């Protein structure tokens, strides 16, 4: 029973979602030549770091989680694990994860993990989430760290490919998160969390969602234009972006914003999973003839 509680507090669903993006970044950089020990070290290392961040987040948010219908039954809210024990648990998970990334992958992968962790726990969870409408924007940077870590674990350098991945996954986070805030509007309102839909209104949030999806679409194409991914990836990226944008635009005419937001959120998961899979299998070796290479 205790094992289940210690697992729940790490938010396994979030860990799994991040692993898909880590695999995408890792295999994109590997270009068909997979170092399996490095692959395992990277996956486990990122999983432990993400788990640590989630436990710290649960500790920090236990007061506001009590006010939200979705989170009122979380382990720390119900007192199934003491706050002090959760802090020790989170710290041990983080140390293990960072050590695996440093010694099993490379220092760059570890430092990227540290930066993502600091942004998520230190900046987003401790301050921005509660005090600023821009909390989601800052938090998106930490959400984009896992695929970049996977990529840089292979390359050992932060190049244009890593920058494109950072842009893709950061931009994806915004409409994804705003959709959650819309269909969980009352929860965020009750907990006094200043997300955009609550502070500025759902109509303003819809405008932001549309603009971020357009920016996301452009960013996804950069992997092919830069010579990092092939035409199969390009077709899938274009298709999911157009479909997602179409869903966003239909939001201006719907009667039930919550139903629409749930559908938009659901497709966001499909979209990022499809991109992660396609960049894993349809990679290319960038050359001097790629469009971005001539600019970069």
UniProtKB/Swiss-Prot annotation:
Keyword set, alphabetical order: Cell inner membrane, Cell membrane, Heme biosynthesis, Membrane, Transferase, Transmembrane, Transmembrane helix
Domain of life per record: Bacteria
Name of the top EC class for this enzyme: transferase
Major place of residence: membrane
Keyword Transmembrane helix in record: yes
GO cellular component assignments: plasma membrane
GO molecular function, one term: protoheme IX farnesyltransferase activity
EC number: 2.5.1.141
InterPro entries, per the entry: Protohaem_IX_farnesylTrfase, UbiA_prenyltransferase, UbiA_prenylTrfase_CS, UbiA_sf
Catalytic activities: heme b + (2E,6E)-farnesyl diphosphate + H2O = Fe(II)-heme o + diphosphate
Range of residues in the leader sequence: none
Record-annotated membrane-spanning stretches: 9-29, 36-56, 84-104, 108-128, 133-153, 163-183, 209-229, 234-254, 265-285
Pfam family, one: UbiA
Keyword Repressor in record: no
Other comments on record: Carbon 2 of the heme B porphyrin ring is defined according to the Fischer nomenclature.
Family: Belongs to the UbiA prenyltransferase family. Protoheme IX farnesyltransferase subfamily.
Job description of the protein: Converts heme B (protoheme IX) to heme O by substitution of the vinyl group on carbon 2 of heme B porphyrin ring with a hydroxyethyl farnesyl side group.
Record protein name field: Protoheme IX farnesyltransferase
Origin species: Citrobacter koseri (strain ATCC BAA-895 / CDC 4225-83 / SGSC4696)
């Amino acid at each position: 029973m205790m094992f289940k509680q210690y697992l729940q507090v790490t938010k396994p669903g979030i860990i799994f979602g991040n692993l898909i993006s880590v695999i995408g970044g890792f295999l994109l950089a590997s270009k068909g030549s997979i170092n399996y020990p490095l692959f395992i070290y990277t996956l486990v290392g990122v999983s432990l770091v993400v788990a640590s961040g989630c436990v710290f987040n649960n500790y920090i948010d236990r007061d506001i989680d009590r006010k939200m219908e979705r989170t009122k039954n979380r382990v720390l809210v119900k007192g199934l694990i003491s706050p002090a024990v959760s802090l020790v648990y989170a710290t041990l998970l983080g140390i293990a994860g960072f050590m695996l990334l440093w010694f099993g992958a490379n220092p760059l992968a570890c430092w990227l993990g540290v930066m993502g962790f600091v942004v998520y726990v230190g900046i987003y969870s401790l301050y921005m989430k509660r005090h600023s409408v821009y909390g989601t924007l800052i938090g998106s940077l930490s959400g984009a760290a896992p695929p970049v870590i996977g990529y840089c674990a292979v390359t050992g350098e932060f190049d244009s490919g890593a920058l494109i991945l950072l842009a893709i996954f950061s931009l994806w986070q915004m409409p994804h998160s705003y959709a959650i805030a819309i269909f969980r509007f009352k929860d965020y309102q009750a907990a006094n969390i200043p997300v955009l839909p609550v502070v500025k209104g759902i109509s303003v949030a819809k405008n932001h969602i549309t603009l971020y999806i357009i920016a996301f679409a452009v960013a996804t194409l950069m992997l092919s234009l830069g010579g990092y991914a092939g035409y199969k990836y390009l077709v899938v990226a274009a298709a999911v972006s157009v479909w997602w944008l179409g869903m966003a635009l239909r939001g201006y005419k719907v009667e039930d914003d919550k139903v629409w937001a749930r559908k938009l959120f659901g497709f966001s998961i499909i979209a990022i999973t499809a991109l992660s899979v396609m960049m894993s299998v349809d990679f290319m070796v960038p050359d001097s003839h790629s469009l971005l290479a001539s600019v970069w």
